[in-house]
């Protein structure tokens, strides 16, 4: 029996992606989404060249295998606390739903430096 495609698990995706990220994933322009940060933790604009900076809560500890699976959906990891399962990184907006489909992702929210 084939495993279900988790991208079709809207309820799970809704729980994992912050509402603002979900709106972006559905194609809403960033300037139309209330409450988005202007600057990321990395000091760059939060929305930059089609990417957004996010904070993730994932299954702990963060292993090399988990990092590889996150990178395979387009996440560029900028920092982490492997023991606690916290990661900060940048991801293309069009890959947010792929990220949320990963079994190991618990929650994704916008990161903010300001």
Q: What is each residue range found by the language model?
A:
Residues 1-114:
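Autoinhibitory N-terminal propeptides
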């Amino acid at each position: 029996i084939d495993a279900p495609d988790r991208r079709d698990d809207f309820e799970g995706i809704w729980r994992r992606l912050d509402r603002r990220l979900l709106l972006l994933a559905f194609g809403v322009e960033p300037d139309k989404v209330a409450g988005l940060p202007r600057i990321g933790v990395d000091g760059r604009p939060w929305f930059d060249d089609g990417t957004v900076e996010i904070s993730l809560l994932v299954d702990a500890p963060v292993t090399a295998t988990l990092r590889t699976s996150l990178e395979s959906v387009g996440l560029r990891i900028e920092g982490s606390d492997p023991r606690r399962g916290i990661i900060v990184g940048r991801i293309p907006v069009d890959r947010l739903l792929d990220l949320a489909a990963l079994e190991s992702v618990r929650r994704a929210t916008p990161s903010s430096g300001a």
